From Swiss-Prot:
<keyword id="KW-0819">tRNA processing</keyword>
<dbReference type="GO" id="GO:0008033">
    <property type="term" value="P:tRNA processing"/>
</dbReference>
<dbReference type="InterPro" id="IPR024937">
    <property type="entry name" value="Domain_X"/>
</dbReference>
<keyword id="KW-0150">Chloroplast</keyword>
<comment type="similarity">
    <text>Belongs to the intron maturase 2 family. MatK subfamily.</text>
</comment>
<dbReference type="InterPro" id="IPR002866">
    <property type="entry name" value="Maturase_MatK"/>
</dbReference>
<keyword id="KW-0694">RNA-binding</keyword>
<dbReference type="GO" id="GO:0009507">
    <property type="term" value="C:chloroplast"/>
</dbReference>
<dbReference type="InterPro" id="IPR024942">
    <property type="entry name" value="Maturase_MatK_N"/>
</dbReference>
<dbReference type="Pfam" id="PF01824">
    <property type="entry name" value="MatK_N"/>
</dbReference>
<keyword id="KW-0934">Plastid</keyword>
<keyword id="KW-0507">mRNA processing</keyword>
<dbReference type="GO" id="GO:0003723">
    <property type="term" value="F:RNA binding"/>
</dbReference>
<protein>
    <recommendedName>
        <fullName>Maturase K</fullName>
    </recommendedName>
</protein>
<dbReference type="Pfam" id="PF01348">
    <property type="entry name" value="Intron_maturas2"/>
</dbReference>
<dbReference type="GO" id="GO:0006397">
    <property type="term" value="P:mRNA processing"/>
</dbReference>
<dbReference type="GO" id="GO:0008380">
    <property type="term" value="P:RNA splicing"/>
</dbReference>
Length: 513
């Protein structure tokens, strides 16, 4: 980061961010390359090294510098979709590499501005509390006394020019913004980068980082105004408190919410939430929840307020049917790969008064999280691990790998899913997922060696079982290797709800929405 400050020439006011020279630095593309290698949870990054090799990056930078000084640098070839006079051959590949590098470049001034704004302020930073699992203890603690929730799907049909214009207010480097606008319009398949979905906003995996940044930055702009308006109408505005959580830093508690509002403008957030005694808002990517304690009429006003606010002030076309009003008493929230609901836990208390005893019934609201097994099987079916009914299938594409690599891949996928769904109280459905992946692994091995599934399960039974052990099971067997009843111990483990603090993105298979 110190190396980049020399190019940015940032002053203390952080008003003039000159990021254009960074586009021609090879180290930027190395950072983007390392980020891409660590992105996938399903080990689908084969061939990434070939696409982003140092030789290609050097050739691209040299070509860019040469073409920048030519008069006809913005002339396109209408006859060849894979070539133009600016990028030459491999237009799509070069555009992809540049956009990945630009995603790193455009985040630097925001991160530097955030770091400089933290100097001298008593804000605790913790890398262990950046997990998106942190949102569920927040809901468990605050949502039990609320009545209704707005299930909001944020509009996804945004023109990329609007995203660039929003970024223009914070990045004063016109050259970089013109170059970004040029590549967005030059890229032949840019319409496919933003994929409309029936239930959520999604991106293609190519150039995902840049478009997520631009989209989330645009969303945070309207969220900051929404927070301001909410504070103006809050009855406890002077003592309202807030929690600001994003993918890098965690701030425990801030007395004045306007302070949080500044940070949401200064740095891009992926996960963001705030609270007051009557209103709670949570967002992750393209879906948000607004829970409140009030009548359905109030929630209906909030619903149409969001629609008009998006359309009139932020050019985001929306429809009322994308916002659903649901009572928390009998509705499950489908959020971040979990089904969350409020369950009544009845209890009886005997009260003794002199010679008379009275039985008092009491029902306590309890926050319950479960694994949605049907959508999860649907995700496995799309990934060709099973059919739509959940019957395991082989993976012919992996048959060329070694046996150990095949077993490791299947085991890694299950451990990631089990790790992500560790917060569920009822993990019985995970046994079904383990069964599907184990049998799919055995079918793949049998297909490779032209043998039967029964033979491989008999020969690799113990080894195959160990590969599908979760962390909790491994700890149990290491701690109690000679336990008289291991199944009883595992039952106690599976009845516990665990939230991990190292999960910074939703699992690809769990993101079934």
């Amino acid at each position: 980061m110190e190396e980049f400050k020399r190019y940015l020439e940032l002053d203390r006011s952080q008003q003039h961010d000159f990021i254009y020279p960074l586009i021609f630095q090879e180290s930027i593309y190395a950072l983007a390359h390392d980020h891409g290698l660590n992105r996938s949870l399903l080990l689908e990054n084969e061939g990434y090294d070939n696409k982003s090799s140092l030789l290609i990056v050097k050739r691209l930078i040299t070509h860019l510098i040469t073409q920048m000084y030519q008069q006809n640098r913005f002339i396109f070839s209408a006859n060849d979709s894979n070539q133009n006079h600016f990028l030459g051959h491999n237009t799509n590949l070069y555009s992809q590499i540049i956009l990945e590098g630009f995603a790193v470049v455009v985040e630097i001034p925001f991160s530097l501005r955030l770091i400089s704004s933290l100097e001298g302020k008593e804000i605790v930073k913790s890398h262990n509390l950046r997990s998106i699992h942190s949102i569920f203890p927040f809901l468990e603690d605050k949502i039990s006394h609320l009545n209704y929730v707005l299930d909001i799907l944020i509009p996804h049909s945004i023109h990329l020019e609007i995203l660039v214009q929003t970024l223009r207010y914070w990045v004063k480097d016109a050259s970089s913004l013109h170059l970004l606008r040029f590549f967005l319009h030059e890229y032949r398949n840019w319409n496919s980068l933003i994929t409309p979905n029936k239930s959520s906003f999604s991106f293609s995996k190519r150039n995902q980082r840049l478009f997520l940044f631009l989209y989330n930055f645009h969303v945070c702009e309207y969220e900051s105004i929404f927070v301001f308006l909410r504070n103006q109408s809050s009855h406890l505005r002077s003592i309202s408190s807030g929690t600001f959580l994003e993918r890098i830093y965690f701030y425990r508690k801030i007395e004045h919410f306007v302070f949080v509002e500044v940070f949401t403008k200064d740095f891009q957030t992926v996960l963001w939430l705030f609270k007051d005694p009557f209103l709670h808002y949570v967002r992750y990517q393209g879906k948000s929840l607004l829970a409140a304690k009030g009548a359905s009429l109030l929630m209906n006003k909030w619903k149409y307020y969001f629609v008009n606010f998006w359309q009139c002030y932020f050019s985001m076309w929306s429809q009322p049917r994308r916002i659903h009003i649901n009572p928390l008493s009998n509705h499950s929230l489908d959020f971040l790969g979990y089904l969350s609901s409020m369950r009544l836990n009845p209890s009886m208390v005997r009260s003794q008064m002199l010679e008379n005893s009275v039985l008092l019934g009491n029902a306590i609201k309890k926050f319950d999280t479960t694994v949605p097994i049907t959508p999860l099987i649907g995700s496995l079916s799309k990934a060709k691990f099973c059919n739509v009914l959940g019957h395991p299938l082989s993976k012919p594409a992996w048959a060329d790998l070694s046996d150990s690599d095949i077993i490791d891949r299947f085991g890694c996928i299950y451990r990631n899913l089990s790790h992500y769904h560790s917060g569920s109280l009822k993990k019985k459905s995970l046994y079904q997922i383990k069964y599907i992946l184990r049998l799919s692994c055995a079918r793949t091995l049998a297909r490779k060696h032209k043998s039967t599934v029964r033979a491989f399960l008999k020969r690799l039974g113990v080894e195959l079982l160990e590969e599908f052990f979760t962390e909790e099971e491994q700890v149990f067997y290491l701690t109690f290797p000679k336990a008289s009843s291991p199944s009883r111990g595992l039952y106690r483990i599976y009845r516990k709800r665990v939230w991990y603090l190292d999960i910074i993105c939703i699992n690809d298979l769990a993101n079934h929405s």
